[in-house]
Amino acid sequence: MSQLQEMMTVVSQREAAYNIFEMVLKGTLVDEMDLPGQFLHLAVSNGAMLLRRPISISSWDKRAKTCTILYRIGDETTGTYELSKLEPGAKVDIMGPLGNGFPVAEVTSTDKILIIGGGIGVPPLYELAKQLEKTGCQMTILLGFASENVKILENEFSNLKNVTLKIATDDGSYGTKGHVGMLMNEIDFEADALYTCGAPAMLKAVAKKYDQLERLYISMESRMACGIGACYACVEHDKEDESHALKVCEDGPVFLGKQLSL
């Protein structure tokens, strides 16, 4: 077994919000986790499901050798539904961490950081915020969800230092009514860097509003097959060269905003 593949152990699993599960995994792969925004490629035990499931890493604890993932389940025919049935002690065949993550080394204590997340794109932003907290920078975090019953990680973000957290829900059941773009309109400062992950429509809106920001980092969500750049199933167009295919699994999932043609 290579260092990028391991049978990790399920430590715990719970339904964190409606149809969104939180799984804690333990294994030596955690030693390889350094950049927030990378993902794991999980094999589903059901033999009929050949493709692995890419799931972003929400956080990790290197001393405990554990990491946490959050994922939305589908119906009973889906691989994520199968994953949600795993109990503590179960083994999961995992490759990772894969892809390029969010750069944090350049952030300083004087930076004003804007983090924008939507739905199931929120989890990888939590480890990012944890690492940014260590720099002493000021963070404004905008999160959008469909409704209160699918809201995740609010307490975790709130417990970080130097954080201003705002939440919007489409139906107005929690926080500001409307999509996360409405929260963007409330920002009255110039961000030094922006990190975002969420649905394509949200990412497009962020990229349009902040297209002049040099340090704009966008994490793309995409269906994947191989997870290592061999199959070209998860491509995005290069903004500077439309004939060039950017592979989300290998070149991303995190890209500079100026790279993407959204």
From Swiss-Prot:
Transmembrane segments: none annotated. FAD binds at R53, P54, I55, S56, L70, Y71, R72, G79, T80. Residues 3-104 form the FAD-binding FR-type domain. Binds 1 [2Fe-2S] cluster per subunit. Binds 1 FAD per subunit. Its cofactor is [2Fe-2S] cluster; FAD. It comes from the Bacteria. It comes from Lactococcus lactis subsp. cremoris (strain SK11). Pathway: Pyrimidine metabolism; UMP biosynthesis via de novo pathway; orotate from (S)-dihydroorotate (NAD(+) route): step 1/1. Responsible for channeling the electrons from the oxidation of dihydroorotate from the FMN redox center in the PyrD type B subunit to the ultimate electron acceptor NAD(+). It holds the Pfam family DHODB_Fe-S_bind. Keywords: 2Fe-2S, Electron transport, FAD, Flavoprotein, Iron, Iron-sulfur, Metal-binding, Pyrimidine biosynthesis, Transport. InterPro entries: Cyt_c3_hydrogenase_gsu, Dihydroorotate_DH_ele_sf, Dihydroorotate_DH_Fe-S-bd, Dihydroorotate_DHASE_ETsu, FAD-bd_FR_type, FNR_nucleotide-bd, OxRdtase_FAD/NAD-bd, PyrK_electron_transfer. [2Fe-2S] cluster binds at C226, C231, C234, C249. The lineage of its organism: Bacteria, Bacillati, Bacillota, Bacilli, Lactobacillales. Signal peptide: none annotated. GO terms for molecular function: 2 iron, 2 sulfur cluster binding; electron transfer activity; flavin adenine dinucleotide binding; metal ion binding; oxidoreductase activity. GO terms for biological process: 'de novo' UMP biosynthetic process. Belongs to the PyrK family. Heterotetramer of 2 PyrK and 2 PyrD type B subunits. The keyword Translocase does not apply. This is Dihydroorotate dehydrogenase B (NAD(+)), electron transfer subunit.
